[in-house]
Amino acid sequence: GILADDMGLGKTLQMLTFLLSEKEEGKTGDELRTLIVTPASLVYNWKKEIGQFVPELSCKVITGNAAERQEMIQNEEDRDIWITSYDLLKRDIACYENIRFANQVIDEAQYIKNHGTQAAKSVRLIQSGFRMALTGTPMENRLSELWSIFDFLMPGFLYGYQGFREKFEEAIMNDRDEEVSARLRSMVHPFILRRLKKDVLTELPDKIEKTVTIELEGEQRKLYDA
């Protein structure tokens, strides 16, 4: 499913708590092995939070040069959680060919919103049982972004992309078809867990949003149109 809580509501900690519960139920080795794929800037944040909140879970960061990473990947029995970045997963994907993970987590899942990118293709190639996507923005601009995440989670659930376009995207985006939109919501709703700050932090004042429209000028317009 998609854990889509607002930023700051603890998606990382919720995921780690789930993995700890799996270990406490007696799962080890192949039954527990988890691959976490995250932007490079967050790799060591995951490692830090594992050590701080769930030290019972062992982890390793796939890092180093190509040969060092290959050796770490081939030594598959030594840690509960493996952490790598989207970029390194693309480079190392062949090394994962014969490895199966019980769980696969993709953080900042908007990184795979374009289903044709190498990042999106790589996470799909990993052999894994339970899959989870973490993102506060499962869809930013186009319905195809939502399809791409679901195609990672449950391939075929929203059909192939061409089928999705014909059954949902064109009717919703071009015709504003409310019936089709409601049907899509009913399909994806059970698999999206989302809390907003306003729902859980009642002591905070409401956020005030103001939209200001401005015109792009000069170099800004040239860069935007490029």
Predicted regions and their residues:
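Long, charge-dense, solvent-exposed interaction surfaces that engage phosphate-rich ligands
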Residues: 181-183
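ASCE P-loop NTPase motor core, strongest for the SF2 helicase catalytic module
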Residues: 1-176, 185-226
